[in-house]
Structures are given as C-alpha cells and as structure tokens.
C-alpha cells in the first residue's frame, strides 16, 4: 500500500481546496449567498444559545470543569462563562445540535459545526475580524463540509452505512473556516484539512436508544476542525492524500462503494454549497418534516381538525423508516427522531416546536392516542431520498393524500425572514434577557457591516443568562 502511485502533494485535491480557501474573499461571494449566510449564522447561533440549557450541554460543561478545563477566554454561548477556544468550540457545537434546531442539508448539520468553530477561532486570530471576513469563512466551511459528503456519494449511502456525516464530514468544514479566520496560508490550510481527518467520526448507533452522543458529533467536529487549523499554524503536518483514492484516504475508507471523488472540486467557486442548506421550522430530525408538513397542508386545504382523523398512513422508503420510524418517546432525542411522535405532537399541540418535546408534553395522554392512529407502509420501490406519501383518513370516511417533496425551510420553500426571526427570538429568549436577544439579533442581521465580530457579537454571547433552569428533556 505504501507503494501506491501518489499524486504530488501540491497537485492533490486537498491542495487545490486549500488554495481556494485562501484566495476566496467576500467579493467573490454572490450577494444571494452572502445574505443566505447571514440567515444561517443567525439561525445557528440561535440554536447554540438555546442549547446552553440542554442536559447534554450541562453535563459536558460540568465534565470539563471536573477535569480542570473550566477556564479560558472564549464564551460558552448563553452560559455566562468562558473556557479555552477549543473547549468553547466543543461545548457550543454540542449545544447547537442539542435541540435539533440547527440547519440541515450541508454536511448534514453544517451550522452546528462550522459556526461554533469560527466563533471560537476569533479569540485566536490576533486581530479584529470583520463581518465580511467571518461570513466568507463560514461560507467556505459549509462548502468544504458538503463537498466531503458529496464525495461519499451524498447523504443516503454514507449515512445509510451507519456513519453520521455531521461527525465524519464536519471537521473538514470547521478546519476550513478556522483556517480562514486564523489567516493560514495555502500550505498550512492544506495541512489543516489533512489533519482534520484525524477527527472524522460518528456513528448512528444512537438511533436505537436516543443516546446523547449524537449531539457530541457536532461539538467534536467543531473542536477537531479548530484544533486542526491551530496545529497547522504551528507546523504540524497532515496527509496531502486525504481526499485521493488511496488506501486510508477519506473516500476509500468511508465510501468504498459510493465514492464520487470528482465532487471535491466539481464547480468549485461556482456552485456554492450553502445554497442547498435548509433551515428547520420544526425541532425534530429533518426526515420527519415532510410528514409533518403533509398533514398540515391537508388540514389547511380541506379544513378538517385533528380530532376528526381516524388514521394516518405513511408510505415510506426503508432508509427513512429505519431512521425515523420508531415510536419511542423517551428520551427526548428518541422522540425527535420519531415521525409518529413528531406528527402527533404537531396535531396535539399545534406545532412541532421545541416546546412540544418536553417530558410533560411527551407524557400527555393525547400523544399516545394520536400515535396509535399512525401506521407505516414500507415501499422498497422508493429511493432513499424520496419523501413519504401521506394518506389521511377521517372518521367520516373521507380520505386525502399528498406528498411534500420540499419541506418548509428548504431553499425552494424557505421560511420567511419574519418566521426565522420569530424562531430566533423564541429559542434564544429561553436563555438571554429580552434586551440581549434584541441586541444579538440586531448585530447578526447587520453582520455585513460589523467591523469586529468578537467585540460586537461574541461579547453578547458571553453575557450572563437571564434563565438558568435546565430544559426538562
């Protein structure tokens, strides 16, 4: 294997991606991409700040304190305390994924990985980083992270093999964003991307019991990407062949039967991967959203109410059924990965927002009654990325059917600016004071004009919370 014919280091995909990261400036970004980046940064920071009160975040923070790691200069969002930049990336990344509020369609959850790494890197940049520079770094992070997943043949084959792509692909995006913030040169950035392979990992075993480590995948990826950039800045080397079709390479290891190596560089600088990322309107796995939306759409179109429903049949592909067809409602993580619970919560409480997933809501007797009306038909003819067909039969015998190919929040069916800001204020308001929520929203919405992101945004994230009660998950 050591005798394989190798591509010269400066001609590898890793090297070309590094040069792309270094040479790209804000002026290279289409206006629509820059504006979309502002929305996703707002959404990601909102998710991470809300996640400050998640049980996973609390346990992780307590663990770091117990290990003597409880001090530093980088803010833990919404917690009023600071740790080292590396530990802040770990905690804030974990918090960003803790409530299933984070965006999706990137590496899968690019925002929960890239944004915490980029914010933490501000503490180590040694200079003020403008909003335009920060946006550029984040866009590049989303781009590299998604390219990693597409090089595996896209979401379905890689995740279907048992790998959680947020953890396997995310570190490369975090490394790219951090390298850009830190001002690394092309050689250092190439090494950072290679080093990030050491932090690539994460399995879907958590789907079977709702284990908390799914949340850790985002935090570990954020921390690993930042560490990769810092190591490269100090002269540590990473394998240049990481993205080549060689033994031990990323594609060869994680996608031996589905690899698409050309995806690393395909339409580089033309097809910005942020463009395909979705913002979540519901606090559950994205694979549950089309079923929620389908029922909502049928109710809106035909005017029936939840208590008129006799049965809901969901015709679904085997991949999504295996991931989200379960009926466990405890712990909360399991409920958020359950189509039956998510649809039932939407029907019983009027939405599948975070408030619909508390322990009290999950134990509402109406939930069990409604979930009992939902059944599945697994259709092996459907492709892994096909959205389900939803059939609703009413007690009076009427039946309706629909399929939502692009759930709410997708680029072609986006949430409005008003809805996005409402979500932000709702979830961040669980932690910060109304004045701090307003200040943070104002800074983030005007991020393009900000001259020093650390001073004007990170400072607010480090303020003491107005509410400290841990979310009852």
Regions found by a protein language model. Name each.
Residues 111-120, 170-177, 223-227, 288-290:
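Well-ordered alpha-helical segments within folded domains of soluble proteins
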Residues 126-133, 150-162, 172-192, 205-215, ...:
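Active-site cavity-forming subdomains of large catalytic enzyme subunits
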């Amino acid at each position: 294997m050591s005798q394989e014919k190798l591509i010269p280091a400066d001609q590898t995909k890793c090297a070309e991606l590094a040069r792309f990261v270094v040479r790209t400036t804000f002026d290279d970004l289409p206006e629509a991409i820059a504006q979309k980046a502002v929305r996703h940064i707002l959404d990601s920071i909102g998710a991470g700040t809300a996640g400050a009160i998640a049980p996973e975040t609390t346990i992780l923070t307590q663990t770091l304190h117990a290990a003597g790691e409880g001090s530093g200069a980088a803010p833990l969002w919404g917690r009023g305390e600071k740790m080292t930049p590396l530990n802040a990336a770990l905690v804030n990344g974990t918090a960003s994924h803790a409530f299933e509020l984070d965006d999706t369609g990137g590496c899968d959850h690019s925002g929960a990985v890239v944004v915490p790494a980029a914010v933490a890197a501000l503490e180590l940049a040694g200079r003020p980083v403008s909003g335009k520079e920060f946006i550029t770094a984040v866009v590049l992070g989303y781009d590299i992270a998604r390219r990693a997943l597409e090089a595996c043949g896209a979401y379905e084959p890689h995740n279907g093999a048992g790998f959680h792509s947020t953890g396997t692909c995310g570190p490369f995006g975090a490394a790219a964003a951090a390298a850009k913030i830190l001002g690394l040169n092309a050689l250092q950035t190439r090494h950072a991307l290679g080093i990030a392979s050491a932090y690539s990992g994460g399995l879907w075993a958590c789907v079977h019991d709702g284990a908390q480590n799914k949340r850790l995948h985002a935090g570990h990826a954020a921390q690993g990407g930042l560490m990769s950039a810092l190591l490269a800045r100090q002269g540590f080397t990473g394998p240049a062949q990481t993205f080549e079709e060689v033994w031990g390479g990323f594609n060869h290891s994680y996608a031996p039967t589905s690899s698409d190596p050309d995806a690393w560089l395909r339409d580089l600088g033309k097809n910005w991967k942020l463009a395909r990322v979705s913002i979540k309107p519901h606090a559950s796995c994205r694979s549950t959203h089309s079923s929620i939306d389908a029922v909502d759409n049928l109710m809106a179109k035909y005017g029936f109410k939840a208590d008129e429903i006799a049965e809901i049949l969901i015709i679904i592909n085997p991949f999504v059924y295996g991931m989200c067809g379960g009926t466990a409602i405890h712990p909360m993580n399991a409920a958020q990965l359950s189509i039956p619970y998510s649809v039932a919560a939407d029907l019983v409480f009027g939405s599948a927002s975070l408030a619909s997933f508390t322990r009290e809501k999950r134990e509402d007797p109406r939930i069990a009654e409604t979930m009992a009306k939902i059944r599945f038909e697994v259709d092996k003819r459907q492709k892994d990325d096909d959205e389900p067909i939803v059939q609703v039969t009413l007690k009076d015998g009427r039946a309706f059917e629909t399929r939502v190919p692009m759930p709410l929040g997708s680029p072609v069916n986006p949430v409005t600016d008003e809805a996005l800001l409402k979500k932000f204020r709702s979830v961040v308001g669980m932690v910060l004071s109304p004045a701090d929520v307003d200040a943070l929203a104002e800074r983030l919405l005007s991020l393009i004009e900000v001259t020093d992101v650390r001073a004007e945004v990170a400072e607010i994230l480090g303020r003491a919370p107005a509410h400290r009660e841990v979310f009852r998950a």
